[in-house]
C-alpha cells in the first residue's frame, strides 16, 4: 500500500512539470530579449505583449532571455510558451527537443524562406552538381547558410560529396571543400568577394567556376553593378539546395496546450491586418509580416542539408551558448 502511494506521488510530481495549471492556461509567456530602456519606443516588446493580450483575451508576460540557448531552455522547462529563434537555433530546438514551429517572420517579398542555389556562367562546361568536382568555388563566407552550409550539406546528404576528416568536427567541412572542389574562395567580412554579391562577382570575374548563393542572386545583386554581365550570360544549376528559413516562433507542445497554441497563432496573425500591427512588426519584430507555418514545411529541407554537415550540432551548441 505504501509503495503504491509513493508511486502515485512520484507520478503526480512528474506530471506537474508537464501540464499547465488552470492559472497558467490563461497566461501567454513570450521569451524575448529585453533591455531596461528603449530609445525608440516602437522597439519596446511590451507593445507586442499588450497587442497579443488585447487580441487573445489572455494575460501576456515577457520572459526575459539573453540568448537563443536561454530561449530554448525557457521552452524546455515551461517558463515560456513561445520563443523567436533563428534558423540554426530552431533546428537545434526541433532536433534535440522536438519543439514545433508555428509561425515565421516574412521577408520583404512576403515569403518565409529563400532558396539556396548555385550559379555558373552560361558557357560553362558545368552542367550538373556532379560536375563541380575539382572546380573552383565562390562562397559567401565561412559557414554561411546559402553560401556554404546548404550546398555542401545537400551534396553530402545526396552522396555527391564525401566528408573528409572527423565527422564530428566542423573544421572537417573546410577539408571536405578542399578535397572535393578546386580552389575555394571563402572570404571574411570586408573582403572583396564576401557576401552574396561578392560570391557572384567572384564567379563573374573568373576567380571561381561556380558561385553559391540564392535563386534571386542576379536580381538581388547585379542592378547598378558594372562588374555584372547581362542576365543571359548566367545560368543557375539544378537542382536547388533547399529553403533557408526565416526566424520561426517555436513552441514546446509538452508544456503548452493546443488550445493556447491556436490562440497564439490567431492573435499573432492579426498583426498583419489590425491597427498598430504594422508598427509592431517593424519596430519589435523587424519584419513586414508574419505567417503560419509547420515545422516540416519551414525547416525540413534546411534540416536535411545542414544535418549532413560534419560537427554542425556541436558547432551550433557552442555558438548559441555564447
Regions found by a protein language model. Give the residues of each.
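Periplasmic-binding protein-like
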Residues: 29-35, 103-120, 165-187, 221-265, ...
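Bilobed "Venus flytrap"/periplasmic-binding protein-like clamshell domains
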Residues: 25-55, 65, 112-200
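Secretory targeting signatures
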Residues: 1-25
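N-terminal segment of the mature folded domain
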Residues: 76-107, 111-115
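Hydrophobic residues within well-ordered alpha-helices
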Residues: 75-76, 132, 203-204
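An extracytoplasmic/periplasmic, membrane-proximal ligand-sensing/linker region
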Residues: 25-32, 36-47, 256-322
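A ligand-binding cleft/hinge motif common to bilobed small-molecule-binding domains
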Residues: 84-97, 154-157, 196-232
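Solvent-exposed loop/turn segments at secondary-structure junctions
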Residues: 35-37, 89-91, 108-109, 124-126, ...
Amino acid at each position: 500500500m505504501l509503495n503504491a502511494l509513493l508511486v502515485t506521488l512520484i507520478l503526480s510530481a512528474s506530471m506537474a512539470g508537464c501540464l499547465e495549471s488552470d492559472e497558467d492556461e490563461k497566461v501567454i509567456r513570450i521569451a524575448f530579449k529585453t533591455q531596461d530602456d528603449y530609445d525608440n519606443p516602437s522597439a519596446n516588446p511590451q507593445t507586442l505583449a499588450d497587442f497579443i493580450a488585447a487580441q487573445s483575451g489572455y494575460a501576456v508576460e515577457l520572459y526575459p532571455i539573453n540568448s537563443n540557448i536561454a530561449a530554448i531552455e525557457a521552452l524546455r522547462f515551461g517558463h515560456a510558451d513561445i520563443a523567436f529563434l533563428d534558423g540554426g537555433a530552431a533546428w537545434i530546438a526541433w532536433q534535440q527537443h522536438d519543439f514545433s514551429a508555428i509561425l515565421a517572420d516574412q521577408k520583404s517579398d512576403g515569403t518565409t524562406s529563400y532558396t539556396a542555389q548555385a550559379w555558373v556562367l552560361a558557357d560553362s562546361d558545368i552542367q550538373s552538381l556532379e560536375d563541380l568536382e575539382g572546380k573552383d568555388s565562390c562562397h559567401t563566407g565561412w559557414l554561411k547558410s546559402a553560401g556554404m552550409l546548404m550546398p555542401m550539406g545537400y551534396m553530402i546528404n545526396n552522396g555527391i560529396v564525401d566528408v573528409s576528416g572527423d565527422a564530428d568536427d566542423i573544421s572537417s567541412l573546410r577539408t571536405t571543400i578542399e578535397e572535393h572542389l578546386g580552389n575555394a574562395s571563402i572570404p571574411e567580412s570586408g573582403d572583396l568577394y564576401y557576401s552574396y554579391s561578392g560570391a557572384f562577382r567572384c564567379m563573374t570575374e573568373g576567380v571561381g567556376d561556380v558561385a553559391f548563393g540564392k535563386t534571386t542572386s542576379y536580381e538581388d545583386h547585379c542592378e547598378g553593378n558594372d562588374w555584372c554581365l547581362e542576365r543571359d550570360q548566367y545560368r543557375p544549376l539544378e537542382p536547388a539546395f533547399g529553403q533557408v528559413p526565416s526566424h520561426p516562433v517555436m513552441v514546446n507542445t509538452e508544456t503548452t496546450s493546443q488550445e493556447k497554441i491556436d490562440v497564439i497563432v490567431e492573435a499573432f496573425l492579426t498583426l498583419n491586418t489590425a491597427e498598430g500591427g504594422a508598427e509592431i512588426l517593424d519596430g519589435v519584430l523587424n519584419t513586414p509580416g508574419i505567417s503560419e507555418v509547420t515545422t516540416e514545411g519551414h525547416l525540413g529541407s534546411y534540416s536535411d542539408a545542414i544535418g549532413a554537415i560534419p560537427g554542425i550540432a556541436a558547432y551550433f551548441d557552442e555558438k548559441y551558448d555564447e
